[in-house]
């Protein structure tokens, strides 16, 4: 029996659909688990100004001769613990930087002190601007839930000098991030730093923290925004706020957006992140039944 053109098209279509479904299943399986920030010990093709090589997190894709390279081997693997029952509230479209109007009567279930193990706490902290910033952060004490997966957006400076401390601080403060636990920045429900934590931003260079007392002399080649799942009460809206903050930083400080694999962050990648959030919410609902 001869097979016509129509039958061949049907067979080819079924094969393509099966391939798409398998690729989506593989990506979801590969995206689960704990966040691993990789701290590198060297940059490729960068001048050695002071004898100390910069150290960036994770493997890098070299897109030009000034782009940093990342070694997978001698790098410590650190797990993210940004696990909080948090509240968020924004629509699916690009959010504005402002307070999130969420239910105020719900109990907070987060522990900012366990926000991320990607950074190393500093010893002998001084009482300068750090103390003032920390007074703005709410004190929350609750047992964190395990993190299933973490959504990461990296912003890498295009300039060799990196992001300068004062300009970086001004930019992220305008986006509502506030300095807090683990010596990193957190975005709360309110722009004033009140309410539940939606996402956080860590320094992508060792030790992964920020020193506000020496911010005038501070610079870094990259920062990492991250949001843990399970986490905010409204993770899709919180993710949109995180995307807006990362885009603002990249646009105003001449940075480049990268995903968790150090590939260029495209609109398709952002939609894939949103789909991961939807899939995680669906799995959580099924487990509760």
UniProtKB/Swiss-Prot annotation:
Ranges of Basic and acidic residues composition bias in the record: 81-99
Q: Name one GO biological process term.
A: division septum assembly
What the entry lists under Pfam families is as follows: ZipA_C
Q: Which residues cross the membrane?
A: 2-22
Stretch list, region Disordered: 66-141
Q: Where in the cell is it found?
A: Cell inner membrane
Per the record, ranges on the Cytoplasmic side are 23-289
Q: Which SMART domains match?
A: ZipA_C
> Where is the sequence biased in composition, kind Acidic residues?
100-114
Pull the Periplasmic topological domain ranges from the record. 1
List the Gene3D superfamilies.
ZipA, C-terminal FtsZ-binding domain (3.30.1400.10)
Q: What's any one GO cellular component for it?
A: plasma membrane
Entry-linked CDD domains:
ZipA (cd00231)
Q: How does it sit in the membrane?
A: Single-pass type I membrane protein
Annotated keywords: Cell cycle, Cell division, Cell inner membrane, Cell membrane, Membrane, Transmembrane, Transmembrane helix
Instruction: Supply the HAMAP family for this chain.
Output: ZipA
NCBIfam families from the UniProt entry: septum_zipA
Record's subunit section: Interacts with FtsZ via their C-terminal domains.
What does the UniProt function comment say about this protein? Essential cell division protein that stabilizes the FtsZ protofilaments by cross-linking them and that serves as a cytoplasmic membrane anchor for the Z ring. Also required for the recruitment to the septal ring of downstream cell division proteins.
User: What family does the database annotate?
Assistant: Belongs to the ZipA family.
Specify the protein name. Answer: Cell division protein ZipA
Organism listed in the record: Pseudomonas aeruginosa (strain ATCC 15692 / DSM 22644 / CIP 104116 / JCM 14847 / LMG 12228 / 1C / PRS 101 / PAO1)
